[in-house]
Amino acid sequence: MNQTKFTFLVPSYKASFLEEALGSIKNQTFLDFKVIVSDDCSPEDLKPIYDKVCGGDSRFAYRRNDENMGGKSLVSHWNLLVDMCDTEYLIMASDDDVYEPIFLEEMDKLVQKYPKVDLLRAKAVRLENGKVVLKDGDIPEYQSQDEFMQYFGVKKMVLCLANYVFKTEVLKEKGYFPDFPTAAFSDSATAIHMSRNGIATTKDILFTFRISNENLSCAKNYSKNAEKGVWANLMFLDWYGQHFHQHYPYDDFAFGIEQYHLPRLPFCKMFKYYCEFRKRGYMKQIRPNLTILKNWFKLRLL
């Protein structure tokens, strides 16, 4: 294991915010880290941005995939980088999100305070096209896995990937990131899995999660990948059942499927997947009434 403590892994494809993202990593007040910037065969020229921001910093390294991986599987690129990581902890960063300068400094304090936890998290704010739409609420500094699950996807919490710090060897032992379509729920599944020994969270917001028209997560691009998103829902629920031997416990998940995911599909596919959710025994509370139909028509009349 490398003596350096942390590695930022930065799978990169978009140029728009890369300079700001890399600058926020370079400007960390805690200096014991290194960075692998991995160009996913982008059609945009990312290397000059890398050279401008951090080309002279020996902690940073740049590589480029011979072929694009993210178009087929974002998670395969993540896991390739996890394989390259040789430090005790890793952060799966991105090409457009921003860290506060004391992000790593505060994370290291939590590492020292809670050495047995395998997962740490910075509180976050979510931006959509430049506007704040969600901030983390009150979250305890330490939570057991059960306590974390009471918050996850239910309480006021920004769900994303790049604000987590993972213990590298444990992530590898648990099988890396699960590969769901468009990487939907891959981060959530990993966070849940890695929280077995608890999770430590910063008291302040130290991370900005950016959603723009270039993200798969934005509504416009999600609609293009709606069927993959619904399939990822099913894969996540299957994964949860395999690891925890019970159905995913929260009604909020069913609400999201009913209100957001299924109505984005063409009608016949919507009905097909609705039946699949019911057949597998997931979310019996998905109601056989007009709610999904109402949302289906509403989306098409906008």
Each PLM stretch: what is its role?
Residues 11, 143-223:
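Conserved nucleotide-sugar donor-binding catalytic segment
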Residues 143-146, 152, 183, 205, ...:
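Catalytic core of nucleotide-sugar-dependent glycosyltransferases
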Residues 102-135:
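Conserved donor NDP-sugar-binding/catalytic core segment of glycosyltransferases
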Residues 26-66:
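Acidic donor-binding segment of Leloir-type glycosyltransferases
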Residues 66-85:
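Glycine-rich, basic loop-to-helix element that forms the pyrophosphate-binding segment
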